[in-house]
Amino acid sequence: MGHLLRRTDLPHRQIVNEKGWVSHDLNEIYRNTVQTVKTLVAESGVAPETIAGIGISNQRETTAIWDKATGKPLEEAIVWQCGRASGIAQEIAEQGHAEEIREATGLQLSAYFPAAKMAWLLRNGGEERQKRAADGELCLGTIDSWLVYKLTGDHAFKTDFSNASRTQLFNLKTLAWDEKICEMFGIPVCALARVCDSDAVYGTTTMEGLFSEPVPICGVLGDSHAALFGQGCLKPGMIKATYGTGSSLMMNIGDKPIQSSHGVVTSLAWGRGGKVDYVLEGNLNYTGAVITWLKDDLKLISSAKETEGLAGEANPADRTYLVPAFTGLGAPYWDEKATASISGITRTTGTVSYTHLRAHETSQDL
């Protein structure tokens, strides 16, 4: 069992426009990735030549498009929280495909997942972009595939089973891109990444010259799946809860998929040694992100650390609560039209009350 020597991080911008669309700068994410590794090596005192391998754990569902030949992004990435593609998901639902998609992919039809986001990126670029995608000139992928592409010398375009299963384009039974569903969304299969075991070797990297010899990228997992693995939930019935920007309640269900009738979704946990495991998961769109809202938009706090003291000052009898549906409601409701609301406000409600708002979606569903 290894132990943690050091950790480092760099924030990247949360780009929100006047429509509430949330985007990320792909080049900024790549630059920050390289810089954090360089800082980590420098501060830990580890000799670069002793590093045996690199793993990637990424935010899921955030969707990117870039030129396969040049690596140049065509647009900013659409963040998992962003609901700009909800109209496309609604179109597919009105065509009567929602249940068929859920049966094949394990996922409720929603703009939360990359399929609708990819369709939006193609439509937004017009016929020329759609033709280039069909001709195999463009890459449509999630953040893991973007980082693998940028880090590897041969520009490998690969993803793992956990990330592929969250696109709403991957068939959980055939373990392949579902051509029929791809066609529904207008996504050419040739624009999607090659799907590999989570513990496969994805290529090698020098991390822009940091390593004198290339180091293998030998593990890729979506962040929630990596948390499940890291918490040792390797057997059916084992469960973990992750609280971050959003939240995830995930249970290992073993080597056969189970479809829930209660609003949670089925995904692949990972692929290891040629075998896969499955999970059931409930996702909440906004939990920790509420702190960012309190800080950046309401200006009620200047740092996340202040919330602990303010929570201690709050009146326990205050019944003010928040439904943080800033981008709709996740599991088990999957209501993309829902909006955030604050209830229970009285004359005594003040700043302390607002920063101690009970996150109703979180407390009720987790």
Please tell me what each predicted stretch does.
Residues 15, 78-85, 246-247:
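Short, acidic/turn-prone active-site loops that include or flank metal/cofactor-
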Residues 1-75, 103, 211-219, 349:
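N-terminal glycine/serine-rich phosphate-binding loop of ATP-dependent small-molecule kinases
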Residues 2, 66-76, 234, 254-263:
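A glycine- and small-aliphatic-rich helix-loop capping segment at beta-alpha/alpha-beta transitions
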Residues 86, 92-107, 112, 116-157, ...:
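Active-site core segments that coordinate phosphate-bearing ligands/cofactors
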Residues 10-13, 80, 264:
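A generic structural motif
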Residues 179-200:
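A conserved helix-loop-beta module that forms one wall/lid of the active-site cleft
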Residues 25, 82, 223:
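Short, conserved phosphate/pyrophosphate- and ester-handling motifs at nucleotide-, phospho-/glycolipid
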Residues 43-80, 108-114, 148-171, 196, ...:
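Short beta-strand-loop/turn "lid" adjacent to the catalytic site in phosphate-handling enzymes
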